[in-house]
């Protein structure tokens, strides 16, 4: 088990009222990082029948969130642990309309009026205390405008892109 029992219990409570179905599509290479992502998301999706895992072999490490089989525009090229674990939880809750700090109707209209397509990439450290706020805000843009994609990238895994 990757996630501790108390975390799984909290996730069960948080996701108890999900109204949509969510697929966490992971693409992963063979090896330790891919196995770690699989273990984490296997545990994560085990807490609710509306959460499913789809696993694909790939040369990159990636997690994409789908709502009712459709892309949400949210991708993590990371193992979203540390501070970014909250970003993953909120991505699901916000996609379901149950998260926190959801924008009001006026702000949603402004998001929907943005000239798209836009592909936003955030390079983050899983120990950064400010990064989750940025990631969560940009995820909201993707949720409210289908022409926007946001990808959070762990700079410690994708060092060649950071340099």
Summary of predicted features, one role per range:
Residues 7-11, 105-106, 163:
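Short amphipathic beta-strand starts and helix->beta connectors
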Residues 8, 23, 53, 92-102:
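N-terminal secretory signal sequences
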Residues 98-114:
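Long, charged amphipathic helices and adjacent flexible linkers at domain junctions
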Residues 39-68, 147-163:
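Thioredoxin-like thiol-disulfide oxidoreductase module
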Residues 2-42, 112-151:
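Local sequence-structure signature of Cys/Sec-based thiol-disulfide redox active-site neighborhoods
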Residues 66-100:
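Non-catalytic, surface beta->alpha helical segment in thiol-disulfide oxidoreductase systems
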């Amino acid at each position: 088990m990757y996630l501790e029992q108390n975390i799984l219990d909290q996730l069960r409570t948080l996701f108890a009222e999900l109204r949509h179905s969510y697929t966490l599509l992971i693409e992963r290479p063979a090896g330790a990082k891919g196995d770690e992502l699989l273990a984490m998301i296997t545990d994560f999706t085990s807490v609710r029948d509306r959460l499913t895992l789809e696993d694909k072999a790939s040369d990159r490490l990636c997690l994409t969130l789908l709502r009712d089989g459709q892309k949400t525009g949210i991708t993590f090229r990371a193992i979203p642990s540390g501070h970014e674990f909250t970003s993953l939880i909120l991505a699901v809750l916000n996609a379901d309309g149950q998260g926190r700090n959801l924008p009001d109707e006026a702000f949603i209209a402004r998001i929907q009026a943005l000239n798209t397509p836009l592909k936003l990439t955030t390079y983050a450290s899983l120990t950064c205390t400010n990064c989750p706020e940025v990631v969560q805000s940009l995820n909201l843009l993707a949720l409210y405008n289908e022409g926007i994609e946001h990808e959070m990238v762990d700079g410690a895994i994708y060092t060649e892109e950071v340099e």
